[in-house]
Amino acid sequence: MQAINYDIDYDAEANKVGLIIGIPEEIYFCSISKVSTVYVEYINNSWVAWRESYVPNTNQRTSYKLITQGNFELVIARVKSYLTYIKRNKG
């Protein structure tokens, strides 16, 4: 049996779900409201996704929610589901 070797284009996959590239292959983000942002970042050999909310017109964080952590495919799939859920409940 031969090993399958494939490379993931992290930036392209993140763009497909609506994330903006902060630092290529390291951090991505998406604003979901005037006061909330979703982040995806590669930290300590693992991908982590979370949402932060802020006090309007300040940098002071009011809440933090861990969405998921794990390999890139898992995190992107969960972020896609989370963003779909948020968009569905906004409208």
Each PLM stretch: what is its role?
Residues 1-3, 84-91:
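Short intrinsically disordered terminal tails
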Residues 1-34, 58-61:
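Negatively charged, low-complexity tracts enriched in Asp/Glu with abundant Ser/Thr
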Residues 6-9, 67-71:
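Non-membrane alpha-helical secondary structure
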Residues 16-18, 22, 45, 87-90:
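Short, flexible coil/linker elements and helix-boundary hinge sites characteristic
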Residues 19, 29, 38-40, 47-50, ...:
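Hydrophobic beta-strand residues in large extracellular and virion-surface proteins
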Residues 34-64:
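Short aromatic-glycine-(Arg/Gly/Cys) micro-motifs in beta-strand/loop hairpins
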Residues 59-61, 68-87:
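A short, charged, amphipathic alpha-helix used as a generic interaction element across diverse proteins
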